[in-house]
Amino acid sequence: MTNHTRNNKQSKHNKTQKIRILPNLTSGQRQEICKTYSNVFNTFEDKMKPVDITLNKEINNLFKIPFTPSKITPNNDFYSYINYRWIKDAKLNENQEYITQLDSFRLVQYKVYRELLEIVKEYTRNNDTKKSREIGNFYKSQLKGSSLSQVKQYANETLNMIDDLRKDNKNLWKLLGVMNRNEIISWGLPFNFNVFPDNKNPKIYRCYIDPGKLTLIDINLYYDDGTDLAYKSNYKRQFFKYLNNLFEFVFGKNHGFNVKDIYDVEVELNQLFECVGRINDPNYYNIVTTKIAMEEYGFDWAQLSEYIGFEKTPDFFISGDLNYLDCCTQLLKKNWDTEKWRTYWIYNYIRQLVRQNQDGYRIYFEFNGKFVTGQTAAVYDDLGPVFGLGYAFNSFLTNEYISRYENKQYVDYLKTMAEDLKTVFTRIVSRNKWLQPKTKEYALLKFKHFKLIIGSPKTLRE
């Protein structure tokens, strides 16, 4: 009984204390206490200064102050209009004059090029292994370049190989295979071989056969349709001048080649993109087996893969355009060994070869750099080796660069942002009411398995 009485008294005492601490307050008083109470986040309300709404007129006037010359408007040059002040302050040094489009990406790219070359110099200086010697020899070779006599020797050896193969029409696949071994020239061949991750299963590498790239970046130049006559005439005149200088540099003034054959061949190749009759996969993913390639297209995948260097023919390759595959095969089988195509084959080789010689590179630059892209200066001489090193030692350079310069904070930030975006889009699709159930199901499945690689993949192909 005594304990019960004591508890009741204590309870009454507590209630009395509460009443003393928190008397009846008005709504405004409670808010004031809550604002200043030590365990509550500070609000920004009390820090806001009253703003005279008449200042709106002054603010509007500030926005009207021009920050670009009057001739630059969002309508005629949006890029310069937005970035005028940055462009005005950003200056290229002498070694960066090859850059034609001034932006932060290209300036950072230049910085990365320099850092890669420093990695090469440091690695070869501090290591004495087979790889370090290979990298060192390659770097010195690229820096020194090839002499004119070496250029002529390599060009004539390749031309002799082409002529030997032309003696038998069946050697088409051998020629394509041998030339596709070299990535520096293979991109311009009628059939360009590559090994890429499978578009439908990135963990597996597949063989891809795709059209090569034509020389002229404006495909309208391959059409004689009566339009832009002055522009096309001038462009082709510059192109033929470049081709003639190229062949004279390598084979002498009396080289005997008709350089206009190169343009004519590329006109034929461009027309192949208009071929029809085959049904293509909408995602440019057409699996072509060795048997189908030979029986339906006349494309000898077995021979081509053998001369590329495969000991065993891959069961299939992937083509982005079956119509091109069909029509180009027929064109090559009919014409590849003609004089016109002889000029084209050797052109694919020597246009890259001359870039290894200082004087030859100037010929290449005058057309491809100065005329086509508007470069005011060639790539600085000591920067040149970085491009060849990128082909020969790509995995090594990537791994070394990441080990030295990776910023984990940036990587983590981008990963988090990407995951947040993935979550947002997943929710949007989940709430969608108009998609077909099956389509919605597959879309969500893709989001679930979607992976974004930032920096570099865990493993790189050597």
Where are these regions (language model features)?
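Compositionally biased low-complexity segments enriched in polar/charged residues
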Residues: 1-35
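Short, Gly/Pro- and small/polar-rich lid/capping loops
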Residues: 33-66
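Active-site-surrounding "flap" and adjacent substrate/cofactor-binding loops of secreted or lumenal enzymes
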Residues: 52-58, 72-76, 81-149
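Hydrophobic/aromatic-rich, well-ordered segments within soluble, folded domains that form packed cores
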Residues: 67-88, 227-247
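Noncatalytic, helix-rich "gating/capping" subdomain that lines the substrate-entry/channel surface
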Residues: 111-421, 457
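Long, K/E/R/D-enriched contiguous segments that form extended
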Residues: 399-462
